[in-house]
Amino acid sequence: MSGTLALTEQLIARASVTPDDQHCQRLLIERLAALGFEHETIESNGVTNLWAVKRGVDGTAGKLLAFAGHTDVVPTGPLEQWHSAPFEPTHRDGKLYGRGAADMKASIAGFVVASEEFVAAHPAHRGSIAFLITSDEEGPATDGTIKVVEALQARGERMDYCIVGEPTSSARLGDMVKNGRRGSMSGKLIVKGVQGHIAYPHLAKNPVHLLAPALAELVAERWDDGNEYFPPTTWQVSNIHSGTGATNVIAGHADVMFNFRFSTASTVEGLQARVHAILDKHKLDYDLQWTVSGLPFLTPRGDLSNALAAAIRDETGVTTELSTTGGTSDGRFIARICPQVIEFGPLNASIHKTDEHIEVAHIEPLKNVYRRVLEQLIA
């Protein structure tokens, strides 16, 4: 059994459902300390975070390449729907099954072993290696990576490159990497009316009827045209609720929850202003609360994306695609202190599902890609 596969199985065997790390990071610390990494643990509201650094011979003047990942996993769902116990690593048909196999314990194991091999081959490496690991990525993400980033910001520390081990591959290992992510902003809208008997609409004010024209305009609005890296911004309704459940009562208010996924072609302030303008145009009496979950970030083509593309091509023969599709990731926090953030990891078809798995044949190539990037950028 390869060292990468063995470490992946050790991590899967720990039921680290958010925010419980189940001592996964302790296992990583033991491996990294043996390589000469200095580490610190940052805990916040039950979340465990790890920042570990091994300086190169150039010290703080050299480039720093970080790996960012999460030891936490999503809940298993109904156990009876799994064909094997989710926290007992199981081999079947050339695949390794277990919660977190693809998202993202194989990636973490891969970068740890890649670092071990790199340090052994390049003991006088010029640049520095770092790990930023959290147990709060799959949950609220309020006490995880963001807390480490804030601590690093406070003392003036930065990264030059960061690889986030998210499972980005689609059909073949390495066919897609993420060089950015869209921002996410949600709104909770309450349109006020006047409750009344449905037989006497002149004595009431139906908020659903008042809302409908504005809602149609919001749905039809083209918010931007996107750009070279991002598709156009989208606006989607997630929930609509009004009424008491009775068939003879006009509701007193209508509630709508919606979400923007927006690119660098738009701003939070600009999108909010346009929504308010449409609602005001329709003379609605309303309350609107906004929640910004993350701002968009983008890494243009550069040293990290080029090194990763070359490593993937040399290891797998695959020509990778830069993409910004999908949901948010912790890359949005890391981009505050790192100019080049790229996500790369295994196939994502089974993540968050029952019978999550990774192809065993992909585990060593994944590790080798990470090692090749280390060799290109900081040897």
Swiss-Prot record:
Cofactor(s) listed: Zn(2+); Co(2+)
PROSITE patterns: ARGE_DAPE_CPG2_1, ARGE_DAPE_CPG2_2
Catalytic activity reported: N-succinyl-(2S,6S)-2,6-diaminopimelate + H2O = (2S,6S)-2,6-diaminopimelate + succinate
EC number of this enzyme: 3.5.1.18
Residues the entry annotates as binding Zn(2+) 1: H70, D103, E166
Pfam families: M20_dimer, Peptidase_M20
Top enzyme category: hydrolase
Active site: residue positions: D72, E137 (proton acceptor)
GO terms for biological process, alphabetical: diaminopimelate biosynthetic process; L-arginine biosynthetic process; lysine biosynthetic process via diaminopimelate
Gene3D superfamilies on file: 1.10.150.900, 3.30.70.360, Zn peptidases (3.40.630.10)
Binding site for Zn(2+) 2: D103, E138, H352
SUPFAM superfamilies on file: Bacterial exopeptidase dimerisation domain, Zn-dependent exopeptidases
Cofactor, how bound (note): Binds 2 Zn(2+) or Co(2+) ions per subunit.
UniProt entry keywords in alphabetical sequence: Amino-acid biosynthesis, Cobalt, Diaminopimelate biosynthesis, Hydrolase, Lysine biosynthesis, Metal-binding, Zinc
UniProt record similarity statement: Belongs to the peptidase M20A family. DapE subfamily.
Protein name in UniProt: Succinyl-diaminopimelate desuccinylase
Organism the protein comes from: Paraburkholderia xenovorans (strain LB400)
